[in-house]
Amino acid sequence: MNQEYIKVRGAKEHNLKNINVDIPRNKFVVITGLSGSGKSSLAFDTIYAEGQRRYVESLSSYARQFLHLQNKPNVESISGLSPAIAIDQKTTSKNPRSTVGTITEIYDYLRLLYARVGIPYSPVTSLPIHSQTVAEMVDIINELPKGTKVYLLAPIVRGHKGEFKREIMNLKKQGFQKLIVNGEVCEIDDLPKLDKNKKHNIEVIVDRIVLDENLGNRLADSLESSLNLADGITYLEIVELPQAVKSQFEKNQRITFSEKYSCPVSGFQLTEIEPRIFSFNSPFGACPKCEGIGKEFFFDRDLIVQDQRISIKDGAIVPWGSTSSKFILETLKALADHYKFSIEVPFISLSQSVKDILFEGSGEEEIKFEFHDGSKTQIIKQPFAGIIPSLQEKDRTIESVLIKEELAKFKSEHKCTACSGFRLKDEALCVKIANLHIGEVAGMSIAALQKWFIHLEEKLNQKQLFIAKRILKEINERLKFLMNVGLDYLTLSREAGTLSGGESQRIRLASQIGSGLSGVLYVLDEPSIGLHQRDNTRLIATLKRLRDLGNTVLVVEHDEETMYEADHIIDIGPGAGIHGGRVIAEGNAEKIKHFEESITGRYLSGRQTIKVPSETRVGHDNRAIELLGAVSNNLDNVDIKIPLGTFTAITGVSGSGKSSLMIHTLYKAALKHLEPTSKVFPGKYRELKGLEYIDKIIDINQSPIGRTPRSNPATYTGAFTHIRDWFVELPESKARGYKVGRFSFNVKGGRCEACQGDGLIKIEMHFLPDVYVKCDICNGHRYNRETLEIKYKGKSIADILMMTVEDAMQFFDKIPLIYEKLITLNEVGLGYIKIGQSATTLSGGEAQRVKLAKELSRRSTGKTLYILDEPTTGLHIDDIKKLLKVLHKLVDMGNTVLVIEHNLDVIKTADYIIDVGPEGGDKGGKIVVCGTPTDIAACKESHTGRYLKQYLI
């Protein structure tokens, strides 16, 4: 008998306080609560981890060695558990070979479709290429009127230069009597002399036949002989037609037969049409030049000389650095003397011809170089190779990976010139369905692709339709699922590494629905992230469909609409960190509203809200940043004006062009202007005005604050520097002569050398996951005994790293340098995290807020432009309230804050809104409306305005 609930008893993972909870099976369940309250600890680190662990444990020891076995979570028991699948926010893959098409398997079905019903065309002549068996050829010939005289020809030479004496001699030996040479019938013993410098066509007359019913096997035998002579190609030439018979055929008409996929005119051949030739991950299909990546990398002049305002002598040529190298300096001086230019003037002032010589070389022109080595002088006259050819040679010959990585910094990415970015060989791209090759189809948006497949059935013949029916069904279903999760703007060729966390999660969600599994526990992490309110309804319908297939859908979510649609809600809290970890409320949305202790309930009931500001800021004296003519990605020659000294929101449906406009164009262009040596490449635009009003532009994104466990909030914000300085000044430290390095766990001296300051020892286990155990020398404290003896208020430096931000604030309340760093972490809602918590354990939203805290603690100039891409990711509405307070504080200090956001509680507090759209992908990239929240709500064309209206009431 099936159990009705997943029963969790005694869950104590991370901050969970011995939780007991019953989760209804085969229902849509939302786990909510403040950021850091313990939602993920319950959903992912307890329930999913145990479900996955039990499944892997059930496998043989041989199979287990290839799988990662989860550690047993800190829980007494879980019953009623199903096999678990986690669909989290982590980006799918950074591998450039992984695309939306390969992840969803749509591309696999496309390959099969093209292999089975695609028609190959010659890339030279555009003629269709057919492959036929001898039996099919015989059937076609038998359709000719009886009594027709035909020649069966073997084209042994097609448009090639030469005399072909050997070939003609071989034909004589085989007994052939007549040839057609350049259109003239000739006896083989009486051939005209062939000009070896001209192109010729030579066909062997294999057989002369009058078609009737008594040919027997003669026709098939002659065809086989002809095909063998001409490498699988033969011509049938109609010499004479019966006079009394009307026919579609004409005298002297030629019919081409090929047992291979071969163009009879150009000779272009296809050896096979199988799914593998359409795979850019297979040597049979990948473009040989780019090896299936679709891109080439070339040394770029703009990367070699990144700041043209400085001189060559001062290091304008970045790979050569400053001219401290005597050899380089003497080389450049010789060039300057020869071409009459100075290496001490700004690079921008050099003539274009001099720049061309520097980059590409002097060609065959020799230059006199003088090299001095002490008392010796060596004079060499030779051409100058050029910076780019020199770098290319070094890149080709050097074996050092480090040097190759360094050289890669001076290369830019371009579409492959051989395959035009389609990744495939010519053989694959010549196969078409409805006049499109597979690369063109993969480059269409999901929405356009769905329409194309609907109309495709009308364009296929009965045979093709019969073959393609099941393939089309699979493709159409997967496209529908992608449409339902709001990804209609993506293309199948989009690289997986360029997707946001929310996009990659929804792709995997669509794939899971396509798999049709039932009896599974799905655990999802905020699937609504990055999704416009318009598409949220479709996403919820998708989650419900997953439930209706007979699965339990467990979603960590903050979205109100999702909570109202859920069958059951579990609210974890009441606060974050040590203040959370308890089940505060359970039930549907209506029940949650009435729990007084539930912060979620207070917002659902309206007892607590984020208020709309009574007035909006107008900015500094009409000063603004203007970006004109932006055309990056799908942007359609966009002009925007951002008033300075305001809180501005960039809105629009997913894929409309918000990030292309703000991150890839505005941010990168402004950064390149303010910091010319920065290695960023802005999207194309015409003009950028108003940068004289700002001195800094900062992109506060969700990338990790550190890649190693040694990075933590204290080190990132700079608080740890002041803490170490404080410990050095303690009397006991001074008496022992300790320096700052003594209190670092990154260098020798004060750290525990047994674990090298990690506090943990990694033990490799056969058939089991690696185990991390506390270092038994320092007991996990990271430092050696002598360092831990230094204490302030009875606490060692290791004790302080284990404190939460809130505790550390109280502990250092009398030390302003430390307190000011910590209070900003608390202001952004991170009071619950430990100041020494490993950076690798922080979520993207937490990492973003740590960065925001660092910016808050800096001395403000009031001339900074901050850009944040979806800062509400992972935030409860109460956390959003705190975040808005911080962002508005930055604006009140004179700065400008620009947020790309879907959350309507954030959008309604903006001073100015730029709505991009109206749709995603090709149908986006325009400015729908700009203005105050009231202006946006009044715009009928704006999807954002339609939903924003009810938030302004």
Curated annotation (Swiss-Prot):
Keywords: ATP-binding, Cytoplasm, DNA damage, DNA excision, DNA repair, DNA-binding, Excision nuclease, Metal-binding, Nucleotide-binding, Repeat, SOS response, Zinc, Zinc-finger. The lineage of its organism: Bacteria, Pseudomonadati, Pseudomonadota, Alphaproteobacteria, Rickettsiales. This is UvrABC system protein A. ATP binds at residues 33-40, 652-659. Belongs to the ABC transporter superfamily. UvrA family. Its main location: cytoplasm. A zinc finger (C4-type) spans 752-778. It comes from Rickettsia prowazekii (strain Madrid E). HAMAP family: UvrA. The keyword Zinc applies. Forms a heterotetramer with UvrB during the search for lesions.
